[in-house]
């Protein structure tokens, strides 16, 4: 599985979190893992750990996003866009092995695929403030 595909699956899990109670997190992770096509144990573990880390830091990530995004606080953002932005901001702030430009580009591509017509530009605009 490519890093882009892994990132896409992390996004899918973060999006699910918006609609389910945190007590259902383990069940949602298991459902996501069941949807994956032949993932290795290492890939499953990486996805699970990254999702858990992002969820653990969610309040901090949201505060950073609110600070940088003018006119659009996290509580007003589309859930798809917010999940993508949280993922990218987590990578920018906590994963030094991923270049910022890569995180932003991957986020924009996810926004174009899963978001509304203007999501790519919106996500790029918010994340550019983290570069």
Curated annotation (Swiss-Prot):
GO terms for cellular component: cytosol. InterPro entries: NusB-like_sf (IPR035926), NusB_fam (IPR011605), NusB_RsmB_TIM44 (IPR006027). GO terms for molecular function: RNA binding. Keywords: RNA-binding, Transcription, Transcription antitermination, Transcription regulation. GO terms for biological process: DNA-templated transcription termination; transcription antitermination. It comes from the Bacteria. Involved in transcription antitermination. Required for transcription of ribosomal RNA (rRNA) genes. Binds specifically to the boxA antiterminator sequence of the ribosomal RNA (rrn) operons. Belongs to the NusB family. This is Transcription antitermination protein NusB. It comes from Agathobacter rectalis (strain ATCC 33656 / DSM 3377 / JCM 17463 / KCTC 5835 / VPI 0990) (Eubacterium rectale). The gene is nusB.
